[in-house]
Amino acid sequence: MGRLANRAAPTQAGDTMARVDTATRAAARITRVRSRVLDLPLPADFRPAWGRGEVQGSFFVTLVEIETEDGITGVTAAEAGPEAAVAIERFVTPHLVGQDGAAPERLIGVLRDAEVLGSPVYFVEVALWDIVGKLAGMPVYRLWGAATERVRAYCATGEVRTAERRVEDCRRIAADGFRAVKLRFHSDDPREDIKVVEAVRRELGDRLAILVDANQAGVLPGMGGHRQWSFQTAVNVARELERLGVVWLEEPLSRHDYAGLRRLRDRLGTLQLAGGENNHGIQEFALLVEKGCYDVLQPDAVLSEGVYQIKKIAALAEAAGLVVAPHTWTHGIGLLANLHLVASIPNTSLFEFPHEPPGWPASALSQMLVEKPWIDQDGCLAPPQRPGFGFELDEELVERYTVARFG
């Protein structure tokens, strides 16, 4: 009798949980997916180091909202124009409507299939987890374990500038409260870029940790190219940066040159190698870990994989003694998605905070949000505490700069 009684209680509890699960699925059933393409202005011309000869006065963002039966809306965005919205409408919406929006793991296959068809839409998973967080009434990073409440940010610059101007920039950056800065290497002769690092180190000493981004992972289509480094050039630059006490060198070789990256890493002492923003899919990152290419992995939650899939990548990195420090130079929603991600993992370090006035200040990156992220007095960022990813759209601004609608 005792054994039979003990079996009955779990059955009743199971029935209750089943009813709750059924109610949740009904509430989270996806009813609509809509996209708006925005052309967001920059306050001044911006000359990206990774696009020689390019001058940007604005940037495209495709804002995607996934609506559920009970009125909860999950929001995400891609740094892309109408092509992203078309991909969503063709390859994603037909497979999401009617599905359980609170079950992202069941839907990640849809996003991967779209990527196979040439349309990377991993960023959509952010909206699904936004729904989950709002249903649970919790910030996403807390749902995922809340490894920390704050992360140390570094100021990511985006242009190639003279040594004199960059020193002045770095004085301002330090005064703003940052403890680290990332500089760009894109001169035909890397020795010119090394002079900039030398000047910043000489003038600011140890007030700022220095990171360097070579952007050698691949030339972006449609943007001005830059001279690709040979393996020996990467070695020579790395040795000079090591001498100057630089923390890491980012993307010194092609993103798929696994053997070259490992050889380079094996030759270094204190300088770390970082990269991964241009790699896609959990399998590529597993290969980067297996081959020992980097000390620091830099997947982006709206570019590289689904945001929760990157949490899995972080676990692979943790097992190998590596850290994850995401790329975030996209838009404010992407920045916050990555912030929740790193706040939920134990193996992170510095967090990228794009800020290159006058052309690309942090406020421009996050202009479609009501509250613009900024560092605290310790140079750290804290994820928003509201449910989901915790941001609110500036609907007036979004409407003002919307140039196309889908769904």
For the regions a protein language model found, what residue spans apply to each?
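Glycine-rich, aromatic-flanked loop segments that form ligand/cofactor-binding clefts
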Residues: 123-161, 207-210
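Flexible C-terminal active-site loop/helix
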Residues: 19, 25-43, 56-61, 331-407
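Non-catalytic terminal accessory/regulatory regions of metabolic enzymes
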Residues: 6-10, 15-73, 80-81, 86-89, ...
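A cross-domain feature marking catalytic cores of carbohydrate-active enzymes
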Residues: 78, 155-158, 183-185, 208, ...
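Metal-dependent enolase-superfamily TIM-barrel catalytic cores that perform enediolate-based chemistry
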Residues: 150-263, 268
